């Protein structure tokens, strides 16, 4: 795993957590793999240059990471492909986001995938102060520029 000079990395081996801010580059294998029980936390605007294979947690939610309140300005961009792995017993890939539960234009954390997305990932949304409102298209939490199945993110 190679890192760019602009990368700040925190690796707590006992908890198997990686915090990326602002850039994490997967250069040797082209992929960052999160094992079950592992986590990638990304607060602010971060880029993973490469592919992401996850059987663990992707934490964009300040609530889950112990950050400062339920901020809705976190974004992780994966420049390659994404694979969410799930072992069928309810454990596996998951994504946590903070979102103001309101109309279509509500503030939210976002996951952006420039390539294809496959597999299954459960999505956990923390309400960041919204009172609820009607939506026409829904709140855009996840953008996949390539191909993805309807059940890739549940």
What are these regions (language model features)?
Residues 1-122, 126-127, 131-154:
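Extracellular beta-solenoid/beta-roll
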């Amino acid at each position: 795993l190679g890192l760019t000079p602009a990368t700040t990395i925190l690796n707590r081996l006992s908890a198997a957590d990686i915090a990326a801010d602002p850039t994490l580059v997967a250069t040797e294998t082209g992929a960052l793999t999160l094992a079950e029980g592992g986590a990638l936390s990304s607060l602010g605007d971060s880029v993973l240059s490469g592919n992401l294979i996850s059987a663990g947690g992707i934490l964009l939610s300040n609530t889950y990471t112990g950050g400062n309140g339920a901020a809705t300005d976190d974004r992780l961009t994966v420049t390659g492909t994404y694979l969410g792995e799930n072992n069928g017993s309810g454990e596996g890939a998951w994504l946590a986001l903070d979102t103001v539960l309101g109309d279509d234009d509500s503030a939210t954390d976002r996951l952006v995938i420039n390539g294809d997305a496959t597999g299954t990932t459960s999505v956990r949304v923390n309400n960041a102060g919204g009172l609820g409102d009607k939506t026409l298209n829904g709140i855009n939490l996840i953008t996949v520029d390539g191909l993805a199945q309807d059940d890739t993110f549940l």
